Amino acid sequence: MEARELGSPTPTYHLLPKANQHTVKEDASSPSQGSPETMQLKKEISLLNGVSLVVGNMIGSGIFVSPKGVLKYTASYGLSLVVWAIGGLFSVVGALCYAELGTTITKSGASYAYILEAFGGFIAFIRLWVSLLIVEPTSQAIIAITFANYIIKPSFPTCDPPYVACRLLAAACVCLLTFVNCAYVKWGTRVQDTFTYAKVLALIAIIIMGLVKLCQGHTEHFQDAFKGSSWNVGDLSLALYSALFSYSGWDTLNFVTEEIKNPERNLPLAIGISMPIVTLIYILTNVAYYTVLNIQDVHKSDAVAVTFADQTFGMFSWTIPIAVALSCFGGLNASIFASSRLFFVGSREGHLPNLLSMIHIERFTPVPALLFNCTMTLIYLVVKDVFLLINYFSFSYWFFVGLSVVGQLYLRWKEPDWPRPLKLSLFFPIVFCICSLFLVAVPLFSDTINSLIGIGIALSGVPVYFMGVYLPEARRPLFIRKVLATVTRVTQKLCFCVLTELDVAEEKNVERKTD
C-alpha cells in the first residue's frame, strides 16, 4: 500500500545525521503509534507464493543440465535413481528441521538468524560474511550466465556464444530482476509464480514423453538396472553431492519468514507441499531421461534435457533450451529475493552497515539491500572463471546448515519453554546433523585444496568482525565512519528510504541475541 493511499497524513522522515543512528524521527504530523502503517517489511507472501519460491529456487538449471553427475559416479540407472531418492529424503528432513526453526524463531535470514540465536554474533557474522563474499553473488552470477548462454546459443549453433554478449545479457537479467523486486514485493512474487509454473510444465512434458516411450515398450535400459553399479564409498558420496546440488534451495522460505502471512501455519505447510513435488518431479524426470538415452548419451551430453528433446520432441525440440533459460530466470529471481533479505537482517542486527536495513517509505521493499546484492553479483560477472568459485563454498555451506540444526538441538535444551508451533521428534535433527557431518567431511578429503580455500575465505571475516562489529564505534577508524555516514545519507536521498522499525510482536517470543 502506498503512503498517499492512507487516510492518515503522510509522515515526513528526516535524514539520519549519522550512520549509526537506530531511530527514525518523524514530524508531529506523522501517524500515531496505533497506525497500522509501520515502517517494516509487509507480510505479502501467501501460501501459494511460498510454494512457488521454494519450488522455483530448487528447480533451477540442475535437473535440465547436470543429471549426468549422479550417473557418472553411480555407473548404473538403478543406483542413480536410488541416490536421487536419498537426496530428496535428506532434503525433506533438512526442510522439516528448518520448518521447526522458522516457526520458533520467526525472523528472516534462515541459518544466519538461527545461528545468531543459538551461538551468538561471531559465528553468525562468519556465516553472513561467507554468503556476502562468495556464496550468494557467485551462485547468482552462474545462474545469470547459464540463462544468457541458453538464450544466445541458438543464434550460434556451430560455436560458443560470444563471451561479452553472454555477460552483458546476464548483467541485464540481474538488473531487471533487481528492479522488479525493488518496485513491489508483489511484482517479485508474481514473476516467481509465473516462471515456476513454466518450468514445472516443461518438466511435466519431459515426464509425459518418457512415460509414453515406456508404454511403447522402451524398457531395455531398466531390465538390469543395477548392472555395473559403483559401490565405492567415495563415488557414492560424490554422486550424493551432485544430487543435493540440484535439491539446494529448500531453505529459501526461511530467508523471508517475516514477510509470510501466518508463518506458523504457512511456512511448514509450504515446505510440506514443495518438497514431495520437487522430489517426485526429479525422480520421474530422470526415469524419462533414462528411458530414451543410454549411459554414453548422458555422459556425452552438455545438457541432458536438450539431448532428450532432440531425440523425442522433433520440431518442438527448441522449447527445452527456452525452458532451461526460463528456469534459470525464475531461480535467479528467487535467489535475489531471498539473499537481499539476508543482508537486510544482517544489517538490522548490526553486522552490516545500517543503510542495508532501510526500506522504501512507500513501496516497503529493501531497496538498498537489493542494490547491494545486485552490485556484488555484477562484480562477479566480470570474473572470467566465476564457475571455479563454486568449488570453494561446498564445505562452508553444509557446515553452516548443519550448525543451524545443531543450534536447534541446543535451543531445545537451553530454552525448553519457548513456544514451538511445530515440534519434531529429535530423530530428525539428530539424523540430519550426522549426515551434515558426513557432507562436511567429504570435500575435506576429496577436494582438500578448495575446501581449505573456502575455510580461508570464512576466516577472512574475523578481522572484519573485530573492526566493524566488536570494537565500539568510537574506536573504529574515523575515515570509515565518515564514508559510511555519507553513503547512508546519499542512499536515503536517492532511494527514498528509512530504517525499519522493530516488530514488537515478532520480537516478544524470542529475545534478541547481542554480544
Curated annotation (Swiss-Prot):
It is found in: Cell membrane. GO terms for molecular function: arginine binding; basic amino acid transmembrane transporter activity; L-amino acid transmembrane transporter activity; L-arginine transmembrane transporter activity; L-lysine:L-arginine antiporter activity. The chain crosses the membrane at residues 45-65, 79-99, 115-135, 168-188, 195-215, 236-256, 267-287, 312-332, 364-384, 386-406, 425-445, 452-472. Disulfide-linked heterodimer with the amino acid transport protein SLC3A2/4F2hc. Residues 1-44, 100-114, 189-194, 257-266, 333-363, 407-424, 473-515 are cytoplasmic. One of its GO terms (biological process) is glycine betaine transport. It is a multi-pass membrane protein. It comes from Rattus norvegicus. The keyword rRNA processing does not apply. Expressed in cerebral cortical astrocytes. Residues 66-78, 136-167, 216-235, 288-311, 385, 446-451 are extracellular. This is Y+L amino acid transporter 2. Keywords: Amino-acid transport, Cell membrane, Membrane, Transmembrane, Transmembrane helix, Transport. GO terms for cellular component: plasma membrane. PANTHER family: AMINO ACID TRANSPORTER (PTHR11785), Y+L AMINO ACID TRANSPORTER 2 (PTHR11785:SF398). It catalyses: L-lysine(out) + L-arginine(in) = L-lysine(in) + L-arginine(out); L-leucine(out) + L-arginine(in) + Na(+)(out) = L-leucine(in) + L-arginine(out) + Na(+)(in); L-glutamine(out) + L-arginine(in) + Na(+)(out) = L-glutamine(in) + L-arginine(out) + Na(+)(in); L-histidine(out) + L-arginine(in) + Na(+)(out) = L-histidine(in) + L-arginine(out) + Na(+)(in).
